[in-house]
């Protein structure tokens, strides 16, 4: 089914998923908060490994942590999804969009497994850490691209 701009609904869904995938790389994939004796500290890390935050926690983790997220892969797949949705022919496009979506979801699965979640309190100190919202948006973007591929395949077979 086409629209005024020449793109079908499946292509628009995959294009939107690719754009959301690119944006998600710059959102927090990991976040942590700690407080002790009324002093709070926080840290967040995006898909490209850029660390931001404040307080003691930032200083401790900036030196010792290695961030091996697959953000570049998700970024590249988002760009490829946009190119595939805009440039390829129908049958190849539908399969390529679906594969890109599955690979983006795979990037989410690899990263969600590598992030440990913790929440605890001891005396007057507390700490919470886990996956940031950007990582869940990666899964949404992958689902959008894969759904666009499935819709495109359905349109081709009709």
What does each of the following model-derived ranges do?
Residues 1-158:
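Compact integral membrane and secretory-pathway proteins
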């Amino acid at each position: 089914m086409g629209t005024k701009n020449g793109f079908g609904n499946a292509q628009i869904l995959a294009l939107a998923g690719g754009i959301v995938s690119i944006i998600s790389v710059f959102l927090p994939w990991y976040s942590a908060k700690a407080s002790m004796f009324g002093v709070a500290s926080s840290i967040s890390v995006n898909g490209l490994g850029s660390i931001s935050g404040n307080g003691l926690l930032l200083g401790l983790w900036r030196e010792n942590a290695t961030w091996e997220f697959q953000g570049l892969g998700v970024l590249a797949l988002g760009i490829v999804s946009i190119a595939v949705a805009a440039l390829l022919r129908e049958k190849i496009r539908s399969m390529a969009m679906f594969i890109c979506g599955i690979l983006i979801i795979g990037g989410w699965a690899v990263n969600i497994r590598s992030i440990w979640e913790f929440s605890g309190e001891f005396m007057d100190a507390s700490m919470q850490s886990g996956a940031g919202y950007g990582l869940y948006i990666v899964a949404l973007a992958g689902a959008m691209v894969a759904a666009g591929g499935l819709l495109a395949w359905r349109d081709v077979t009709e």
